[in-house]
């Protein structure tokens, strides 16, 4: 996989032929010398320990680990919470709140042994029982956790625990969360999880931010509001929230009660301030003024003038495992015909989008599962039937017009006006404006609905849109993480795609046999792309500005910034 990154990056890990090897790209580490962006304060050995300020998103939709599905929320969650296991800076699974773990010979029983002396940020004790509570809370349909099936679906008795959900994810029987086969020992020292089928990447799942524990006392005392105020926000990671001004900033302070897998001797900054900015111009100004030492939202019109890190600059472009796609609301009559969906897809010049609109910071997509995702022998993208979308745009456009006519809409006649919903950040609005023109060439009228980030994602999840920009960054390196999104009833299936053959292929992939696992996932992707259940647009890169003064942080192939060890040099 092509990577444009800084000097001290971790290279793509070797691909293993072992079942679900989960090799992945390593992330970018922080660079050299020193200047602005720190909080005034003490220094020790050339290290400013007071703190630093960054921007990687606006107001988070939620910081409840069970409810979050956005990358900006996850970036904060991995700093203030800690799951059973962690992914370290070398992309290795290491102990988090669990000091060790073991798996039975049949691969079904996972036993985690907790560290001694674990504490919540309020100083109260934490043990395996808190994880049992948190996982059973997540499986409860009343929690409405979008990742419940992805994270817990392989655990024994999941279906009963979730109330035997139907194709839309709604329970068909009384849910029984306590039935989920997750059990803490009486002394809280061990957590035993029994799976319904072997899942060799379950250690990576146990390191996923969504699998972080939440404190039962504060959740039950404060309801959904528990995670909206520092007064009620209890966490267990190396930092905790001490100040939160919506639309302005969140201040994280070093957690004095932290016990866990991160090296406490490397957690040196007293505070990390997160600027909650949605306007990329404001983010850029914060960086140029020295207020922030890292900003993710860079104005796209500034990119041509920026100097890349490998050329001695402070602009970084780093490949991540994910796909930018467009969701069609398949519950709308306008999109029920696969010929229409294919026409809309074929009318998009993806090379123009990636290289002109997105200025080469993304790569044109020809499938939903992109490069870098491993297969039994190599990469899934290379071993499958991609490209599903030809690079010959002129031929594609002619085919699009033909399909639209076959669907009963010659030159778009009789087709309803449709609306494209997006938040206004990065390339989202320029892409929407391009789609207006591209689909206009088919005779289709597209309007644009620009929304605030905090309201956009709930509306998309609720199906309150016609067409919406979407995307997915992988949580672990297996194609199932991307393809599972499109299962009937999946909480992240925003387009409400549903095909029994696709679901059957996904179900058949949940086996210990590696060859069969990947064969069924290839079959599932074939079905999804033949249906054009979503419109793949581009493969993700992250791009950001970072001052050379910021040390100790790293960027992962899953789009996360790890700030735990961050500090300002000088």
Q: What is the predicted function of each stretch?
A:
Residues 208, 224, 257-305, 445:
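Ligand-site clamp/hinge motif
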Residues 15, 245, 347-380, 426-436, ...:
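Detector for C-terminal structural segments
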Residues 88, 253-259, 320-343, 347, ...:
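A bilobed periplasmic-binding-protein/Venus flytrap-type ligand-binding module shared by bacterial periplasmic
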Residues 99-153, 192, 334-336:
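Aromatic- and charge-enriched surface segment that lines or borders ligand/interaction sites
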Residues 88, 92, 167, 177, ...:
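Gly/Pro-rich hinge or "lid" segments in bacterial periplasmic/extracellular proteins
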Residues 55-105, 234:
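N-terminal lobe/hinge region of extracytoplasmic solute-binding protein
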Residues 113, 132, 139, 143-217, ...:
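Surface-exposed binding/hinge segments that line
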Residues 239, 363-406, 425-429:
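Structural transition elements
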